[in-house]
Amino acid sequence: DRVEAWIGEAVAGGARLAIGGGRLSSTILEPTVLLDPPAEARISREEVFGPVLALYRYQNLDDAIARANALPTAFQASVFARDIGVALRAADRLDASAVMVNDPTTFRTDWMPFAGRRTSGYGTGGIGYTLRDMTQEKMVVLRRG
């Protein structure tokens, strides 16, 4: 109900519904794509945790990076570009824990750091980081003889 309400709020505020927006069943929402939701809509300011993709139109790369860096959340970002130099410069400027180039933010390997920034969370997950953070090392020295 929460995600459905956020979709409705965005559409009422001027977002265009490209696809979805309804329910597949009483418990499953359709994958939804919103075009240009208003900046003040909750779907633009908070992590959705639902099958929703919000797409925004920008004037230029500086505008896109400023908008992304102004968000309260900063888990992962994606940059799609034909020019790898442009993509890498954008990745360097984005304040996100991970930046995928020409790949969606669903990419993850077990050994990569898995972290949030700002309101997306603190600390780092992933197998190596979790083992380090969830265990205590102890050294035992045994003198023989």
Question: Which residue stretches match the model-derived regions?
Answer:
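Helical element adjacent to the flavin cofactor pocket in flavoenzyme catalytic cores
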Residues: 6-11
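Short secondary-structure junctions
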Residues: 12-23
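Conserved C-terminal structural/oligomerization subdomain of aldehyde/semialdehyde dehydrogenase
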Residues: 12, 28-145
